[in-house]
Amino acid sequence: MARSRPAGRALASQSGPSHSGQGLVSKPKMLAMVRSMDSKGVARAVKENPELLQHRDTRGRNWLHLCCGVDIGADHRKAADSIRTAEVLVDSGLSINQEAFTEGKWKATPLWFAIARGRNLPLAEYLLKRGSTPNYCLWAAAFNRDIPAIRLLVGHGADVNDSSVDDLAENESPFLGAIKWSHFEAAEELLKLGADVNYQDRKGMTAPHYMLKKGSDKRFFPMLIAHGARGDLKNSQGVCAAELMRKKRDADFRKMAAQLGTSPRRKPVE
């Protein structure tokens, strides 16, 4: 899915091609400057040819998305250069919350590109301080197993139970996504920050359901129990996780089934 992986399925409508004047910086040249984080060159280009700011590529990305999507690795110099370049683009009029493409209510914002592709926390923090919405990005942070990114996003107000994908066929919270990818360190961090351990997707599936289905190692189940996971929540087939665990030959699973909670719970998203 695009919200976690680099490639997107759905693209937003894109503006038509812009037309540069003679002798002005071309779009290929502008692209090279953006990707190399040449903030001074970018500043000159948009000053000489403001029409460049209207450009969006075939995937809906503008220059800010492209800047944020450059993977800087551990190069702190590139992080500083990326912030300066992003600042030029934002100050020149590019919206800090403009999406490149969408999936339902979910949006691929510049911040999402910084988290998902650039893995650029200094730039992400800059965008947040400039007013970027912190939502839509926790799936990417969890997919990347990026604990500092998860903490940064939630610390700036991201909804740890982000519901922006509830209208999609494959609806899942960031926590449930982490469980399905077997990225348990990310799942645990989300739980510590308040994620709903008993989230049910449209199929009624919970974290224990998916872990049992995938054959996840039993050592990860106590994490769910410690955060109040229930075992009596039934999926769309009427099967609850505790029932499946009681049928296991492994006595540890049967013991953990008895430790799962049974308190009242909301209905799955429809």
Show the residue positions of the predicted features.
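Ankyrin-repeat and related helical/solenoid repeat scaffolds used for protein-protein interactions
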Residues: 184-185, 192-239
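Ankyrin repeat structural motif
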Residues: 39-46, 75-91, 118-128, 146-155, ...
